[in-house]
Amino acid sequence: MPETPIDPDLTAQVLVEALPYIRRFRGKTIVVKFGGNAMVDEALKVAFARDIVLMRLVGFRVVVVHGGGPQIGNLLERIGKETEFVQGMRVTDAETMDVVEMVLGGLVNKEIVNLISAQGGRAVGLTGKDGGLIRARKLEVEQPGPENQVPEIIDIGHVGEVDHIDPAVVEMLDSGEFIPVVAPIGVDERGTSYNINADLVAGKIAEVLSAEKLLLLTNTPGVLDGAGHLLTGLSPERVDELIADGTIAGGMLPKIRCALDAVAGGVRNAHIIDGRVPHAVLLELFTDKGVGTLIRRQPE
């Protein structure tokens, strides 16, 4: 099958449009949370890896944080381990945590490293345990009780939240021009392992590194208004209004809160982008239109 001819005018247009963004973000830190359909579709995985390698080649300091919920669920099903969810979070006993570490720290993490390497990049996979990157604490989940009664605390096992980020190992890898690929597993002061939401880990790492941008890949176009239209740019104040009137709800809420926390914590911009679009990361960074919703710390 003959190759499709390359349109030189289109190529030139793309490069000219990208040049100001490359100049602007060169030397800046970009944290990317890899998840959703982009993690299971083979073509999207390759496109993502190419995007990451190109970002590093043009001088961006890139950190990848990944999830892996569907892959964890698939392996638990294969071994006959039943899964229970509370408020959308997987109840994680010791046996399930072993599976989580195997899948996130092993299978998924190393697959992403291999994908990046296959595109000419130099990636190093690690979990939050490596180099003391993520210190975790147990997540307390409150179950609302009857009116005027104290909420019940539900134990969902080895599910945690970020207590502290020590970026030394990430900074060391970056100084050697490696791309850190982080699995969201943390450990507390007693050595207990916890599975942590990957969006939250990406946001906290972005804060500590004073990142220019946090990119969260999703299975939606971004934040939509009541009529289903994409909202391309939002201030924190406007986000609060949309949450209050119910426009932002359901599964988008945790991602929005993660983006807001990151922006409040010093990240300049947070983006919620459609990971189903090939090369979504480059389109968001290097073009005027982008493919998602931008949340700014302040008007630019």
UniProtKB/Swiss-Prot annotation:
Catalyzes the ATP-dependent phosphorylation of N-acetyl-L-glutamate. GO terms for molecular function: acetylglutamate kinase activity; ATP binding. Pathway: Amino-acid biosynthesis; L-arginine biosynthesis; N(2)-acetyl-L-ornithine from L-glutamate: step 2/4. InterPro entries: AceGlu_kinase-like_sf, AcgluKinase_fam, ArgB, Asp/Glu/Uridylate_kinase, Glu/AcGlu_kinase, NAGK-C. Its main location: cytoplasm. It comes from Halorhodospira halophila (strain DSM 244 / SL1) (Ectothiorhodospira halophila (strain DSM 244 / SL1)). Gene3D superfamilies: Acetylglutamate kinase-like. This is Acetylglutamate kinase. The lineage of its organism: Bacteria, Pseudomonadati, Pseudomonadota, Gammaproteobacteria, Chromatiales. NCBIfam families: argB.
